[in-house]
Amino acid sequence: DIKERTSYLQIILAIIIATGLALILLKFQAWRLWKLWFFLSVFFTLLIAFNAFMDQIFALLLALVIASVKTFKNNVFVHNFSELFIYGGLAVIFVPVVNVVSIIVILFLISIYDYIAVWKTKHMVRLAKFQARIKLFAGLLIPYGNKSAILGGGDLGFPLLFSGVLFKTY
């Protein structure tokens, strides 16, 4: 049973564990395991999101098709379309178990983690390069010319969680 006032502890612990697993996959260049983890994450978050507004079997089939195309075909339109729903699925999971104080603590701790991960240990940069190389990442892909930019999943997900908690509370 997760208490709203201390839910940030479990969420931060889960982020630390997931980061550790991601770094292990990176170290061993385990792209097949990364692909499986990515597929399952996309599938389940899409399933949760779609289940909110369609019959369960249709939600299951649509989540399966989109997760498969996103993971195995590298289509920018499917990738970005799925991202719009993935964060809604994450919000359905996390908003009910987080209160305003917890989400503020999470945002504060994530900001510190992000700074350390990008500027000090640089493991976030290594993870981003690994994900870009195998073309499996969380976030929006914005192509321009012969290049592309990425808006990371955390830049979408955390503000959505914050907004969801505020809507739930007030």
For each feature predicted by the language model, list its residue ranges.
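A membrane-topology feature that recognizes alpha-helical transmembrane segments
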Residues: D1-Y170
